[in-house]
C-alpha cells in the first residue's frame, strides 16, 4: 500500500512554495479551465485568438501572455475551416501553434496521446480541447461521478505538467441568476475545474457578450466583449471589487459627502434624510443600508455607525474616525454612550 504523504503546518507556514502561474496574466491559470457558452456564440474564434497570442507571446486584451508551444484540438472542425479562420485573424502565424482535428477518447487513451505530444513539444504552455463531448464516451455510471471522473483525468494531466488546459463546453438554455449553474452537466465539472468561464449574450443577434470568470486562483471578474470582424474585442473589464461597489446604493455615497465636514451626527433616520435633502429614500431602507454596509463601505470611508432603541425613539449615531492613520480602530469615535449599545 502506498504511504500517505503529509506536510506539517510549520513547513507550510515557513517554506516558500511556488504560486500558480498564469498563461494569460490574471485570467487563465495553469491547471484545468472550463470555457462554456451556447452553440455558435463564437467560442472557437476566441479560443483561436487566445492560441495565437500565447504561441507568439503577444498580449490578449492588453494582458501579458506566457509564450510557449500551443496545441488546439479542433474536434468539431476541419483543417480547411481552421485555415479560413486564420486568414481572418492574422497575417502572421507561429510554428509553435499546432492543430489536430481528431484524437482518442478519454477512455481510449487521450491522456497517453497528450503525454506523447509533450515529449515532442516540452515547452508547451497551453492545450485547448474543443469540445469536451468529443473526448467523452457514453456512460451508465452516476452522472456526477462520470463528470468528475472525466474532468479529473484532464486536470491531473494539467497539474503534472504545470500547463493550462482549456476544455470547451456548452451551457444549458435556462434562466438562472448564477450563470455558472447553466454549465451543461453536473457540478462535478465545475467542481473539479480550477477556473470556469461562461460566455453569454443577452440576445442572440447581439454583437456584445459578457464573459464571466471565477476560479480557485482567479478572482471573480466580468468582461464585456464585442464581436467585430471575427474578433472578440474587449469593451470593459470589471474586477470583483468594482462590481461590489456598483451594488452600493447611491445615497451612501452622498452620506459620505454629508459627513465630510462633521465629526459626528446623531438623530433619527427621518432626521438624517431631511438633513441630507433626500426625498427618494425611506427611513427603514436607509437604516437597513447603514447596517448592511457599516463594516465595508462605511468603514472604508472612516465612518462609524451605531443604532439604538430608546424611549424617545430609535437613534442613529454616525461619527468620522479622526486622523488619516487608516488603522480602522474605534478609539477616536466620540458618540455619546446613551445612544450606543
Model-derived regions, located:
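Conserved inter-motif catalytic segment of the P-loop NTP-binding fold
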Residues: 2-4, 10, 17-19, 23-24, ...
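DNA transaction DNA-binding modules
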Residues: 225-341
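Pre-Walker A (Motif I) flank of P-loop NTPase domains
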Residues: 29-33, 68-69
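Hydrophobic positions on the alpha1 helix immediately C-terminal to the Walker A/P-loop
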Residues: 46, 50
Amino acid at each position: 500500500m502506498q504511504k500517505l504523504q503529509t506536510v506539517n503546518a510549520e513547513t507550510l507556514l515557513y517554506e516558500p512554495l511556488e504560486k500558480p502561474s498564469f498563461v494569460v496574466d490574471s485570467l487563465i491559470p495553469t491547471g484545468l479551465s472550463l470555457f462554456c457558452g451556447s452553440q455558435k456564440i463564437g467560442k472557437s474564434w476566441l479560443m483561436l485568438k487566445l492560441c495565437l497570442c500565447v504561441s507568439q507571446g503577444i498580449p490578449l486584451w492588453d494582458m501579458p501572455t506566457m509564450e510557449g508551444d500551443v496545441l488546439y484540438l479542433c474536434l468539431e472542425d476541419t483543417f480547411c475551416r481552421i485555415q479560413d479562420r486564420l486568414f481572418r485573424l492574422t497575417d502572421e502565424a507561429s510554428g509553435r501553434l499546432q492543430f489536430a482535428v481528431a484524437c482518442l477518447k478519454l477512455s481510449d487513451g487521450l491522456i497517453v496521446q497528450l503525454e506523447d505530444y509533450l515529449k515532442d513539444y516540452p515547452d508547451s504552455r497551453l492545450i485547448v480541447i474543443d469540445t469536451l463531448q468529443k473526448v467523452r464516451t457514453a456512460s451508465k455510471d452516476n452522472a456526477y461521478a462520470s463528470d468528475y471522473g472525466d474532468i479529473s483525468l484532464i486536470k491531473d494531466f494539467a497539474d503534472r505538467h504545470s500547463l493550462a488546459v482549456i476544455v470547451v463546453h456548452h451551457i444549458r438554455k435556462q434562466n438562472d441568476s448564477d450563470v455558472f449553474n447553466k454549465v451543461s452537466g453536473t457540478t462535478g465539472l465545475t467542481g473539479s475545474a480550477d477556473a470556469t468561464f461562461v460566455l453569454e449574450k443577452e440576445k442572440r443577434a447581439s454583437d456584445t457578450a459578457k464573459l464571466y470568470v471565477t476560479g480557485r486562483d482567479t478572482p471573480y471578474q466580468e468582461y464585456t466583449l464585442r464581436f467585430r470582424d471575427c474578433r472578440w474585442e474587449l469593451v470593459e473589464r470589471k474586477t470583483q471589487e468594482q462590481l461590489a461597489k456598483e451594488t452600493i446604493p447611491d445615497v451612501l455615497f452622498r452620506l459620505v459627502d454629508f459627513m465630510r465636514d462633521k465629526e459626528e451626527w446623531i438623530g433619527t433616520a427621518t432626521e438624517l434624510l431631511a438633513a441630507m435633502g433626500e426625498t427618494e429614500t425611506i427611513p427603514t431602507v436607509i437604516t437597513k443600508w447603514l447596517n448592511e454596509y457599516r463594516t465595508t463601505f462605511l468603514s472604508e470611508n472612516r465612518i462609524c455607525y451605531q443604532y439604538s432603541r430608546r424611549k424617545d425613539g430609535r437613534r442613529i449615531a454616525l461619527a468620522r474616525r479622526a486622523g488619516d492613520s487608516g488603522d480602522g480602530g474605534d478609539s477616536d469615535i466620540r458618540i455619546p454612550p446613551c445612544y450606543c449599545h
